[in-house]
Amino acid sequence: MADSDDEYDRKRRDKFRGERDSYRTERRDDRRPVGGSAGARDEWAERNPFRGAASAGGGGARHRPDYSDYRGPGARPRYGSPGRDLPPAKRMRPDWGDGDVRANPRFGGYDPYLMQAWNDHYQSMHSAYSHAGHAPPVRESIGGGGSDTLTQPAMLNLKQFLDTQDENISDSEVMRKYTDYKTDFKRQQLNEFFVAHKDEEWFKNKYHPEDSVKRNEEQRGFLQRRTDVFMELLENGTIGSVKVDSSQADALIRVLDTCVIKLEGGTDEDLKVLDEKPKDPVVYERKAEPMQSVKEVEKTINSPKDEISEADPLPAVVSTQRKPVGPVNSDEENWDDDNDAENSTPKKELAEDSKDSDSKPEEKQLNKKKTKKRKRNSSDDDSSSSESSSSSDEEKLKEKYDVEDGLRTEQKIEAEKDRQEATKAKQEPQSPKLDEVEGNDTTEPKGLDSKINTVEIDDTLKSPEISSNPIKNTDNGDSSKVEEDEEKPSVGKDKVVETETIDLDKVKDCQPRALHRTSSIFLRNLAPSITRSEIEAMCNRFTGYLRVAIADPLVERRWYRRGWITFMRDVNIKEICWGLNNQRLRDCEMGAIVNRDLSRRVRPANGITAHKQVVRSDIKLCAKIALNLDEKFRLWAEVPKDDPNSARANESSENGSGSTYGFNSQNPVLQNITDYLIEEASAEEEELLGLTGENKDTEGEPIERDEQLISVLDRLVLYLRIVHSVDYYNHCEYPYEDEMPNRCGIIHARGPPPVRVTNNDVQEYIKMYETKLQQFLTKTVPLSDEEIKNLGAKDAETEVEKFVQANTQELAKDKWLCPLSGKKFKGPEFIRKHIFNKHEEKVDEVRKEVQYFNNYLRDPKRPQLPEHPGTSKRPESESARGGGGGYRPPMYPPFSAMPYGFGPPMMGGGRGGRNFPPARRELPLEHQRRLIGYHDLDAPANSDMFD
């Protein structure tokens, strides 16, 4: 019974243990057994500093403090009415927001949330912000403790600002001071944001006087290149032969791919790759028997018929200039070991063939053999040991990564026939040239010449692989052999080498390059401090790297950015992605993942866009957008720039007058555009025949297509999409597309038209579409000098004067110091002269900093932190509660309805003195709901009630 009574006593006394712990300075959890059933409470014994050694064991004697310790000092009867010495009211959790979190000082504890809020409030009102300044910087939003969104500090409303002013102040003076306060608040936020981000690359590219000019010129170069490609396609009829309809998706994709190949520097010969069937679906299928494909590859390599063609690169996928991926951060375990096993056999065979073909070696070749014998022996030893140790690993890797084996097998089988035919066709016209060149050389037979030529072509084409894989070449002994075989024909057969070099160029020209297809990696996390040069330096170690694109930072992501790294199509993108995931930049995990190819490149828009009335409206909108964007980047401004009349006409066209389209722009797409903007209707005929539009409004009319208008619109839509990266039917712009993996990836086209459409639907659609395109229709005008002056613009000479004063220090009488150089002068005027003469670059930096800041202020769409939710939208009940302080959302309930006995000496009956309305006086004990009953709410507080 003792154990059961003890357990019952423990449960009864510890019923409110969790509530008491937050009121006391020390924890009273030593009453819990250490070895109890609750696993989470096992560590409580280690937290109690007052527990003795006896309590460490489960059965030892435990210190049991008297239960009266929880009640404070003094004796207290166990039974009877508690009177006014009640325990505190039940404490609600702070995150509920509707309970009283104040601690009762009787229990010796305090609430950290309450005191922290009071300290912040007291310091903000009486020390740093006593002159009605700004609130302490609060970067979190109201709702949320877990939100990562950055916001500005909450600004005081008029009522809160009035509490900080003198009582005798007039209304006009209050309004003037409050206006100044809001202006200063905005200036401070802009200045803080500028100081926080001025050293980041994305910010410099926007506003720095030097970096922004370079970036704008780079973008203008991209646009000029796109314009040249578009004009080339417009002249050869490629643009006019396609309609921007979803039914012509293949033709649209071909036009976009043609643009990409041209932008990448491709030729008309490279465009032939668009006629070939795509082989990607075959590449990504996993073979059931991977070892069989390897055997087939070895058969094709060992066959004597294929000696000429087996060393050629694959024309459909790999060009002669491309290099395979070199292993990154891998010593022995590489994903491409199976490729090395395949590539080692043809290299050795080629070396043997070249040795047999060279029947008359010269003295120089013998000397070179002697010098390279050591390298060959050492490399052969290394390769033999490495091959024997990693043979089992290679078999496993071949079974796992058999995609590349299947790719090589199928591509080589398909490409062998084409290569044989190409070599036969080329050897026939070139044979007389070879005879003419080698007419004087009678010692070598022709069959030997052809054999040497074959070896020369093979070695030349394989040289990129050798140079791109230095790690693999050191493990295998093939590199020295191949290098030796390359040098043999170059010593004795100089004339033959020259002839074969010309032939090799012709072979390369005949191979179309799929420049429109790339592989890419998506970087989910890029810190704002990471620069483009750092990413490029990291990616340049990987073979096949092309470019990198970095998006603008977003405030929702705490100014973190996203990035896309583009590589050639034939690289092992998964291995590169694995290598990037093992690296960190500035202690930032980039989160690299493989970027998939685009699934749907042509996406349908509303079919009502094919209606004649909608098409005419779209032509007008497209012309406006093209004019604004052309002038923004000065694409067609070379000729009319010197003519004041044309410049004046351009200004009128920007203001929206449609009569100027095509007359002032040198853009051929906009020539004579006004002829298609004038509506035509048979109004007289309808009036004479008594036709009305009532039936059309109720039943609707069928879609009317005007092919001439549609052809004009399609030319404008493709111009916006190719040149300015504006997808008109998606009313959006694809930014930094020239640096993205897909330069012309997605386009929206007209979808299937509906059967009938009403006039109301047409008008609503036109109005809605014009609203969505407003960002392109309105011209972005920088702020004037007067406007940026109100925002806190700086003056260059004033800042230079401040810089001089800051670097002029008086040490003693007639003794002044310049901190920049450490020299001492007799007067400040000498320091000024010294700074302007010897530290002119520092003065120029100050002037650039001023221009940097003013450029940021001039941008009407400048990035900045969003307003605090408490500033723009405040709760209606905040003023009624008489609390909050205006600096941050209250983390605790108002001061009214406090439990009996609460009264910190500092706070008294109000909130920090006269600046806040006094709190309601404390209510008597009867309002703590000890007894439940009804009474008149309007009655006095001390009215008689039943006890």
From Swiss-Prot:
Modified residues (Phosphothreonine): T300
Sequence ranges of Basic residues compositional bias: 367-376
Bias (Polar residues) ranges: 465-477, 647-666
Pfam families in UniProt: ARS2, SERRATE_Ars2_N
Region (Disordered): 1-100, 285-493, 643-666, 855-890
Subcellular location: Nucleus
Gene Ontology cellular component annotations, sorted alphabetically: nuclear body; nucleoplasm
Modified residues (Phosphoserine): S81, S303, S330, S354, S357, S431, S646
Oligomer and partners: Interacts with cbp20, Dcr-2 and pasha.
Family label: Belongs to the ARS2 family.
Chain's role: Acts as a mediator between the cap-binding complex (CBC) and RNA-mediated gene silencing (RNAi). Involved in innate immunity via the short interfering RNAs (siRNAs) processing machinery by restricting the viral RNA production. Also involved microRNA (miRNA)-mediated silencing by contributing to the stability and delivery of primary miRNA transcripts to the primary miRNA processing complex containing drosha and pasha.
The protein's name in its UniProt record: Serrate RNA effector molecule homolog
Species whose genome carries this gene: Drosophila sechellia
Lineage of source species: Eukaryota, Metazoa, Ecdysozoa, Arthropoda, Hexapoda
Gene: Ars2
